[in-house]
Amino acid sequence: MERFLENVMYASRWLLAPVYFGLSLALIALALKFFQDILHVLPNVFALAEADLILVLLSLVDMTLVGGLLVMVMFSGYENFVSQLDISAGKEKLNWLGKMDATSLKNKVAASIVAISSIHLLRVFMDAKNVPDNKLMWYVIIHLTFVLSAFVMGYLDRLTRHNH
């Protein structure tokens, strides 16, 4: 009975495979939105004010960071929790594949969230005159919470690695 339960639990990791595939569909949706924004801004680029163009560019950078985060979670999560990626020797392979454990992934995700939050906060500050002060305050508090959380996770990871 124990062996059966262990085999079922081990096989259940494959339930995550469609979830990771779903992230690739989310990446496609993000890419479509990215190019929709580019196609929307290009015809009007000369009529846009510099601040408006910068806001659009920050939005594109934001989407790019989210896309990178999706790729990192998709591949690392699949390799850590489902199965190794079988990429033939002749094909290009990302140098971090197979090297990122769950803790490294967690730290990279935290750093990515801080970067995404920073871009979002910069966008908000560029339009600060149209944002109520209490809302600005909450944006800063939330961002600082992300920064502090990432710092604490990295610090705790360093402590646990040092003690082992």
Swiss-Prot record:
Q: What is its main location?
A: membrane
Which Gene Ontology CC terms are recorded?
Answer: plasma membrane
Q: Which UniProt keywords apply?
A: Cell membrane, Membrane, Transmembrane, Transmembrane helix
Where does it reside?
Answer: Cell membrane
Membrane topology designation = Multi-pass membrane protein
Q: Mark the transmembrane ranges.
A: 15-35, 53-73, 136-156
> Which InterPro entries does the UniProt record give?
UPF0114, UPF0114_bac
Q: Which domain of life is it from?
A: Bacteria
Family membership, please give it: Belongs to the UPF0114 family.
Protein name stated in the entry = UPF0114 protein YqhA
User: What gene is it encoded by?
Assistant: yqhA
